[in-house]
């Protein structure tokens, strides 16, 4: 990540680099926002992402998050989606992002109103 940031700065010193990665090394928090990777749209993935995000925070990575609602799999059932959103609002990176077409809160109807 330092190389990427240096390249952007060399290209234009008026631009502040912003990188997103799913893994890194000690010190990655100085260079990039980290997300937990492409997760499944299931209850277990929500549980595992909570543990992953807590671990990242304890490791000094303050700018982190996950794909709210899951990335791979069927569209999440309404209760699962609400729980993902409730968890996601406390993360610096809140992104409803998946291979499905329902990528906004409004795509899930009144369940989040």
Language-model segments: residues:
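Catalytic-domain carbohydrate-binding cleft regions of carbohydrate-active enzymes
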Residues: 1-113
């Amino acid at each position: 990540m330092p190389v990427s940031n240096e390249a952007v700065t060399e290209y234009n010193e008026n631009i502040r680099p912003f990188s997103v990665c799913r893994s890194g090394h000690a010190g990655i928090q100085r260079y990039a926002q980290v997300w937990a990777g492409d997760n499944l749209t299931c209850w277990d993935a929500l549980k595992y992402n909570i543990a992953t995000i807590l671990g990242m925070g304890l490791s000094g990575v303050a700018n982190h998050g996950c794909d709210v609602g899951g990335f791979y799999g069927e569209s999440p059932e309404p209760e699962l989606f609400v729980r993902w959103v409730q968890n996601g609002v406390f993360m610096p990176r809140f992104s409803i992002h998946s291979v499905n077409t329902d990528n906004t809160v409004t795509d899930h109807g009144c369940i989040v109103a």
